[in-house]
């Protein structure tokens, strides 16, 4: 996987990135349910005739308004149906990559026949929870995912318990790669990025390959709110300058347009989110291209961006009322600042300004409008970098920003983890009332 002679801390960083930066086809909350349904279907004796599902309020929030790839339909029911009838149980976040036209037609027919139900799990203390139960006559199979989009904790059929995570705890005593992030700092991450052998991090270039393809697809103007394509048209009309700033916003938002609009191309995700992966990748790629960076320099900038985004998001709930495109863009700000300047002071100032700028943006569920939040976050990240290059930043005398960037991050994450939980409940209540 990588050179075993590396600094042990660096090995943990690389493992953390490999754990959190993965290809994902479709918005990851509906995909989590699709995966549960696909695994359940693989355990079922006979073809699926009916699907029942239960999800946490947060997963419901992020599944109500987003298009499931290849279907032209939004919502969790089609995700559950297609996962059960056409999903690849071994493909993780790419569970729907092999879904055929026939499987899509069958899933839609199952929906039309009223054979698919998705409800909120009550009570539910988990932020990320999905359970799918598939039926063939009186025979059934049920799969439960908790805590992570692909973290299967229980598989059961009508006649046996196939798997339960608790029974495997003794075998898995090795701590999570993410645990190291609670004991590290941005300064240590920067040292790693500057000194790690290129060969050990070359894999991160795959994020540029996948997300650039998604961005190019988004520029066709067929997906979502087509923000990227619209802004590109305004450049051609002379209403918007065609420069580095606009290119960052256009190419980043275009990838999100395609992602949320249901394009059948994978995104390279970050922290379980395609939009976070797009945000952490595309801005950095555009700046790297502008300065003619080679593959090694791009890889180091992308590693700084993705690892910083993971480091910040690791202090947050997996899903919350805080739009995590903002925290991914803080990683992007670090990556862009490194490309232009390379100094820790510039990077920390850029992140502090981001916290002083977009930290209040709410997550009101996954939808086409996520691309607007992605574009706003990307724009704010570049603005923060430009300010930092001029030795200007939001200071510790203002708002929740502290004099130390680590404390600023902790302050932001404390808000999202505690006070904003009531905001999250209110958002879910509003969205649920609209769906009635």
Curated annotation (Swiss-Prot):
GO biological process: L-cysteine catabolic process to pyruvate
One Pfam family in the UniProt entry: SDH_alpha
Domain of life: Bacteria
MF term (GO), any: L-cysteine desulfhydrase activity
InterPro entries the record matches: Ser_deHydtase-like_asu, UPF0597
PANTHER family: UPF0597 PROTEIN YHAM (PTHR30501:SF2)
Record family assignment: Belongs to the UPF0597 family.
Entry protein name: UPF0597 protein YhaM
């Amino acid at each position: 996987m990588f050179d075993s002679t590396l600094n042990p801390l660096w090995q943990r960083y690389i493992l953390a990135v490999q754990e959190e930066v993965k290809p994902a086809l479709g918005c990851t909350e509906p995909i989590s349910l699709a995966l549960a349904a696909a695994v359940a279907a693989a355990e079922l004796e006979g073809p699926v005739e009916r699907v029942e599902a239960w999800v946490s309020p947060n997963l419901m929030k992020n599944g109500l308004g987003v298009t499931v790839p290849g279907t032209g339909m939004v919502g969790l029911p089609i995700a559950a149906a297609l996962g059960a009838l056409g999903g690849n149980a071994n493909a993780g976040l790419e569970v729907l990559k092999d879904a055929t036209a026939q499987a899509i037609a069958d899933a839609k027919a199952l929906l039309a026949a009223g054979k698919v139900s998705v409800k909120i799990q009550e009570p539910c203390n988990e932020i990320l929870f999905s359970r799918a139960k598939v039926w063939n006559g009186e025979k059934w199979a049920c799969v439960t995912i908790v805590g992570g989009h692909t973290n299967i904790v229980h598989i059961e059929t009508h006649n046996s318990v196939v798997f339960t995570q608790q029974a495997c705890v003794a075998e898995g005593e090795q701590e999570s790669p993410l645990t190291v992030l609670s004991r590290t700092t941005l300064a240590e991450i920067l040292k790693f990025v500057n000194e790690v052998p290129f060969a050990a991090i070359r894999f991160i270039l795959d994020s540029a390959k996948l997300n650039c393809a998604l961005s190019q697809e988004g520029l066709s103007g067929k997906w979502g709110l087509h923000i990227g394509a619209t802004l590109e048209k305004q450049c051609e009309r002379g209403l918007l300058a065609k420069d580095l700033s606009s290119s960052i916003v256009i190419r980043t938002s275009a990838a999100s347009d395609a992602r949320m609009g249901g394009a059948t191309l994978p995104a390279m995700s970050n922290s379980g989110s395609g939009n976070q992966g797009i945000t952490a990748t595309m801005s950095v790629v555009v700046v790297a291209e502008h300065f003619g960076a080679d593959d090694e320099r791009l890889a180091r900038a992308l590693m700084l961006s993705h690892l910083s985004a993971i480091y910040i998001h690791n202090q947050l709930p997996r899903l919350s009322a805080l739009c995590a495109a903002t925290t991914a863009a803080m990683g992007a700000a670090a990556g862009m600042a490194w490309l232009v300047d390379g100094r820790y002071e510039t990077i920390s100032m850029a992140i502090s300004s981001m916290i002083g700028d977009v930290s209040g943006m709410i997550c009101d569920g996954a939808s086409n409008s996520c691309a607007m939040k992605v574009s706003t976050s990307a724009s704010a990240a570049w603005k923060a970098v430009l300010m930092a290059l001029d030795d200007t930043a939001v200071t510790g005398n203002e708002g929740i920003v502290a004099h130390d960037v680590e404390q600023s991050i902790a302050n932001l994450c404390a808000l999202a983890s505690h006070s904003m939980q009531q905001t999250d409940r209110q958002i879910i209540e509003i969205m649920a009332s609209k769906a009635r």
